[in-house]
């Protein structure tokens, strides 16, 4: 899958520029055998600094999901970061996403009636998230089937443009998606900003979505290269849910050349690249293969990569207690993960969630040998103002952002 973007969406660099938000430990909960229920329980903001007094619980949960799933990475402007730019869509042609010849222009998802999603009901937004159906071309009805022409599913469906990750969200609980819809409709201020329509070949949807869905395993264990016995490990099961829901397979699944052992094995072909400005990124092999994957790294090194964006191959196996280079075991000259790795969005996740992800990658997958060519970027890429701008789409705690409503 070739995705080209002429700016850096994810601030996966310059960690010292911002402060990571400390997250309260999650409440204990029984592990449900339904993957989606596990992930939903771990995503709740609880009573930590992300919550706001007097706000409905569904909006708090919806905000947490919108933040940790990096919705702002596509749906917020970076080159023209206005105070009201959060979730208001792209502002320049440079922010287009190109996948296999299809030009996607992320939409304004604030509740503006004219240019955003204000004219759609929460049910229509839910249907968009659950089934990938464009809300403007789908009636406000309950859909009970995903087969065209049945159960109110449109006979000729019009789908949302990629990289909208709705195929991964088919494994999420309905309540999660209702919570996101509630947050977008009720907690975000409307911003009037019209985004041009996406453009692409007429047969794009059938070919692309068939491959995309193939990169996302079903909730039941195992896929071809998962460890069957790991389904009994509560921590691994929670981590698996998070990996699926956060669309890790979109980049690390090797979509251009899917095979029986292709889950999370990284880029397989030369076209499995992400072009972001001057950077060419190839998603790495995340299986625990000792030679070509994560096998030689500890769970703590993987955690440090997820929490701080530090390359595990250039970071020792130590506890890090500071975000300041040279302090608290943070490397004096840090080497960061290449975008579009969304770890900045994960600063709103708990440490336990990220440890769960690390456990799944180390203990829940079979090693698959697949050597990925190194990413390419100019020497001054990380330190440029080009990367500093990318911090804008991720609001910090406490809330609100400039264009969120205050209860």
Language model regions located:
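Bacterial N-terminal signal peptides that target proteins for export
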Residues: 1-13
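C-terminal motif of bacterial Sec signal peptides marking the signal peptidase cleavage site
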Residues: 19-22
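Bacterial signal peptide processing site
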Residues: 24-26
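Flexible coil segments in periplasmic/lumen-exposed cytochrome c-class electron-transfer proteins
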Residues: 32-51, 76-104, 134-234, 240, ...
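Local sequence-structure signature of Cys/Sec-based thiol-disulfide redox active-site neighborhoods
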Residues: 60-69, 240-246
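Short, cysteine/histidine-rich loop/knuckle motifs that typically chelate Zn2+
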Residues: 73, 250
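Hydrophobic alpha-helical positions that pack around
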Residues: 109, 286
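Aromatic- and charge-enriched surface segment that lines or borders ligand/interaction sites
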Residues: 116-133, 293-310
């Amino acid at each position: 899958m070739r995705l080209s973007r002429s700016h850096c969406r994810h601030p996966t660099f310059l960690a010292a520029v911002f402060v990571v938000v400390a997250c309260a430990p999650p409440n204990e909960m029984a592990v449900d055998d339904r993957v989606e229920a596990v992930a939903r329980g771990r995503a709740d903001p609880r009573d930590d600094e992300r919550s706001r007094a007097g706000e409905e619980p569904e909006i708090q949960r919806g905000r947490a999901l919108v933040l940790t799933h990096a919705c702002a990475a596509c749906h917020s402007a970076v080159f023209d970061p206005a105070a009201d730019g959060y979730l208001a869509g792209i502002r320049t042609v440079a922010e287009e996403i190109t996948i296999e010849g299809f030009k996607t222009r992320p939409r304004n998802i604030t509740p503006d009636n004219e240019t955003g999603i204000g004219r759609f009901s929460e049910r229509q937004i839910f249907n968009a998230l659950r089934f990938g159906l464009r809300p403007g071309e789908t009636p406000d009805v309950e859909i009970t089937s995903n087969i065209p022409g049945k159960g109110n599913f449109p006979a000729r469906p019009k789908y949302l443009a990629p990289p909208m990750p709705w195929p991964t969200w088919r494994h999420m609980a309905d309540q999660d998606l209702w919570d996101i819809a509630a947050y977008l409709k009720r907690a975000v201020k409307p911003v009037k900003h019209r985004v041009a329509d996406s453009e692409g070949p007429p047969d794009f949807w059938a070919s692309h979505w068939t491959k995309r869905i193939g990169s996302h395993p079903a909730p039941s264990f195992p896929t071809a290269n998962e460890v069957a016995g790991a389904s009994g490990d509560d921590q691994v099961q929670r981590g698996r849910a998070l990996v699926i829901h956060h669309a890790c397979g979109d980049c690390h699944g090797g979509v251009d050349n899917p095979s029986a052992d292709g889950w999370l094995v990284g880029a397989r072909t030369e076209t499995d690249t992400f072009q972001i400005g001057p950077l060419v990124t190839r998603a790495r092999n995340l299986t625990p293969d000792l030679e070509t994957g994560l096998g030689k790294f500890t769970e703590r090194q993987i955690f440090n990569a997820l929490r701080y964006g530090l390359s595990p191959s250039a970071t020792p196996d130590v506890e890090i207690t500071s975000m300041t280079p040279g302090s608290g075991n943070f490397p004096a000259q840090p080497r960061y993960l290449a975008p579009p790795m969304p770890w900045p969005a994960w600063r709103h996740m708990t440490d336990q969630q990220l440890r769960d992800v690390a456990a799944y990658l180390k203990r829940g997958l079979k090693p698959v040998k697949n050597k990925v060519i190194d990413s390419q970027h100019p020497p001054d890429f990380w330190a440029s103002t080009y990367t500093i701008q990318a911090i804008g789409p991720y609001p910090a705690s406490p809330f609100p952002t400039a264009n969120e409503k205050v209860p």
